[in-house]
């Protein structure tokens, strides 16, 4: 029997943590066992200590996968200083484990969080010579500008990260706009440029199924991280009459949004992944946002489970970004506020959304892309 090659997955976030990145990397790890001996270098079991593990979480990690964990960082990640220090220390800890374990003949798949780890892994790849695949969820330092962060020495950081990205064997973008940005990012850095592939996130079409839309007023819903780049304050300021806005999740901007005291905005707090079907079905239309300037710098993974729930999308964000193209090309919602709200039209858009999730964005279809790419 032929010995399988080792694939190392390097990520701060990994199950049983329930962030979207953890969920994605856990499923990718399970899929890859059919081709590799999979080993994981990751952070602690829970990213946010305020959250509890979900006893109803059905995710099971393949028993053959070896997981090496580093200790967590006890800083407030909702502050800029706390997040920066957490990124630095977590990167150092993950790098130390990688340096001690990864061999030249191995393959590596890492995700771009925490950002400093990209620089360290580029250095390690240059030293050891393993095959380095980078799954790009966020593009640093470009993503600091839309977040309103004034990064000192921005030009120097961009040069260093552009060069680091160019050392990869493959960059995996999660959208067409991101592939465009990555191509520009590495174009002047290296003669042997990395391959750029596009592998979108997937929809949980088995765990999430369409339910009847609620009675009464049209309910607009946001479910996910309430961060600086989501621009939810603008949504609240522009909320049309007779539309309710329900927000699920937590994040750095949660308290400031609550202080707006809008009478038709309701906060429901965090939810478990096992509750997604109930949460995503409790609306007529779901909102996906990206801050101005975020073209190609991130693709909200929540989009695909919204499709699975059979709900249309109202999208606010850069034109020609992946979600903008998806909504307009497939007629599954609106880019900007609609001129009128029609429940029958929302139902038809929702049906198209579910059909699209089943045909193009099933887990099986997306995992086959990962297996072929790496």
Please state what every model-predicted region is.
Residues 1-59, 237-240:
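N-terminal subdomain of nucleotide-sugar transferases
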Residues 44, 177, 199-202:
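Carbohydrate-associated surface elements
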Residues 246-248, 254-277:
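Nucleotide-activated donor-binding/catalytic signature segment of Leloir-type glycosyltransferases, i.e.
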Residues 213-230, 236-240, 246:
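Conserved donor-binding/catalytic core segment of Leloir-type glycosyltransferases
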Residues 116-119, 123-127, 152-173:
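Membrane-proximal helix-turn-helix segments that form the acceptor-binding/catalytic region
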Residues 158, 162-194, 324:
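A short, active-site helix/loop in glycosyltransferases that binds the activated sugar's phosphate group
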Residues 230, 272-281, 286-307, 312-325:
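Nucleotide-sugar-dependent
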Residues 338-374:
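A charged, aromatic-enriched C-terminal amphipathic alpha-helix characteristic of glycosyltransferases
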């Amino acid at each position: 029997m032929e010995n399988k090659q080792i694939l190392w997955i390097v990520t701060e976030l990994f199950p049983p943590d329930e962030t979207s990145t953890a969920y994605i990397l856990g499923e990718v790890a399970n899929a890859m066992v059919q081709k590799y001996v999979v080993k994981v270098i990751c952070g602690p079991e829970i990213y946010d200590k305020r959250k509890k593990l979900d006893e109803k979480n059905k995710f099971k990690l393949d028993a053959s996968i070896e997981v090496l964990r580093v200790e967590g960082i006890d800083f407030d990640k909702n502050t800029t200083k706390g997040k920066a220090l957490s990124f630095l220390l977590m990167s150092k800890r993950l790098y130390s484990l990688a340096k001690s374990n990864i061999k030249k003949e191995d393959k590596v798949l890492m995700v771009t969080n925490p950002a400093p780890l990209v620089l360290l892994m580029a250095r390690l790849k240059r030293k050891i010579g393993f095959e380095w695949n980078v799954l790009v969820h966020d593009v640093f330092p470009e993503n600091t500008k839309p977040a309103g962060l004034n990064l000192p020495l921005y030009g120097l950081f961009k040069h260093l990260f552009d060069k680091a990205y160019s050392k990869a064997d493959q960059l995996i973008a999660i959208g067409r706009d991101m592939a465009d940005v990555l191509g520009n990012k590495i174009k002047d850095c290296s003669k042997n440029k990395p391959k750029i592939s596009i592998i979108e996130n997937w929809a949980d079409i088995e765990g999430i199924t369409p339910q009847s839309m609620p009675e009464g007023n049209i309910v607009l819903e946001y479910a996910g991280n309430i961060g600086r780049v989501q621009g939810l304050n603008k949504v609240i300021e522009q909320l049309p009459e007779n539309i309710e806005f329900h927000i699920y999740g937590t994040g750095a901007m949660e308290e400031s949004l609550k202080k707006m005291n809008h009478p038709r905005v309701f906060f429901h707090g965090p939810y478990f992944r096992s509750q997604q079907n109930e949460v995503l079905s409790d609306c007529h239309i779901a909102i996906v946002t990206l801050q101005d300037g975020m073209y190609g710098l991130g693709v909200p993974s929540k989009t695909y489970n919204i499709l699975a729930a059979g709900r249309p999308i109202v999208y606010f964000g850069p034109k020609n970004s992946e979600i903008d193209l998806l909504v307009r090309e497939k007629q599954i919602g609106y880019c900007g506020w609609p001129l009128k709200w029609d429940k029958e039209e929302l139902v038809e858009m929702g049906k198209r959304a579910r059909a699209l999730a089943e045909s193009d964005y099933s887990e099986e279809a997306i995992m086959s892309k990962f297996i072929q790419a790496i």
